[in-house]
Amino acid sequence: PLKWDNTMALCNRLHVQRRTLSMLETTHRLAADLESLAKCERGSQIVQALESADDEVLAALWAAAPQAARPIIKEYAARLRHIHPATNGTTLRNLGLKPVPRFGRILYNLRMAWLDGTVIDQDQEQALLAKLISEVTQ
């Protein structure tokens, strides 16, 4: 395989499109850590590792992955990347909160809770949301 610097030089010489170059960079970065991906146990860990990958990158990673990592990549592509809380920025504004950078943190924490199974229904999401809001507004 080409070293990354040589790959970049070749891409520049061939005038590779920016989108393709971005996919190559993402694939290179994620492929370097496929062994640790196979050790991910929580959904949030898998999402954090793979959320920057689009479908083409996921396909390339799956093809290059050791056998132990392939089911994890498949699980992310098929299910985990689609898990999001019902709460969104509009929900938070409707609750009277002013948009602040902490909105993102609240939504992130809710999503991670769904991914890890610590929240499994709307009632639990609402309880966690109330807790997160109280932490932000104190």
Which functions belong to the PLM regions below?
Residues 1-138:
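C-terminal subdomains that position terminal phosphate/3'-OH groups for nucleotidyl transfer/ligation
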